[in-house]
Amino acid sequence: MRTELFKITASRGQRNAIALFLLLQIPMLVFWGAQASPASTWDGLRARSGLLLGYLLMALGAQIAASEFRWRTATLTWLVTPARHRVLGAQLLTVVALGAALSTLTFTAWVSVGVARHDARTMRLDRPGELAGTFAVVVLAVCAAAVVGVAVGSLTRGPSAALLGLVGVGLLELVGDTSRFRGPVSSPLGVLAWPTSELDAVSLWASLGWAAAATAAALVALRRDLPG
């Protein structure tokens, strides 16, 4: 896991993507919803703290896994760690840890801004159970999106193919009535874009289920040999 974190910090693109996301949070926190009512401030909490982050980590996860094959570092990595599932496990743990940490940061920031603009009651500080439940949903959805990204990157073994595949599948999911907010790419949208006072439980379970299924598929795909 430390190796994977080092790779992220050493990669200019991945490092800059996270830095840009954090910088974008500043004007959003200052200006977005400055005139919003207390109800809309609470209802926007899940989307503002997790939606952009979830899809950033989905893309980042795909890049982390697929870059091993693009730059052929997988050959050396698998020689050092013959148990290939441990490499995939380290990548998954890394994006989950990153997702949990960044979710905590953004969620805390948006709650703090809501309290400053309105009051503690608006952001449910008087109802810690409800606030904790909302936080848990954000973390789960963000981490599930990140896991899907890693799995897709490991399956496709190419960053461009992984990202184009995610975008293409996501668009197809949104077209179909039965697949909208239920597929591996669009289910986090169904969780995080909804008002905080509501929860599409089917989308949440779909998001977690797809993360588990994608991980299983990636583990099976590890048996494939590397191209010569």
Label each PLM-derived region with a short phrase.
Residues 156-189:
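Transmembrane helix segments
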Residues 29, 99, 174-175, 215:
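Hydrophobic transmembrane alpha-helices of multi-pass small-molecule transporters
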Residues 2-14, 62-88, 147-161, 214-228:
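Cytoplasmic membrane-interface segments at the C-terminal ends of transmembrane helices
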Residues 7, 94, 170:
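Active-site micro-motifs of SAM-dependent methyltransferase domains
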Residues 31-32, 70, 79, 114-118, ...:
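A generic structural signal for secondary-structure junctions
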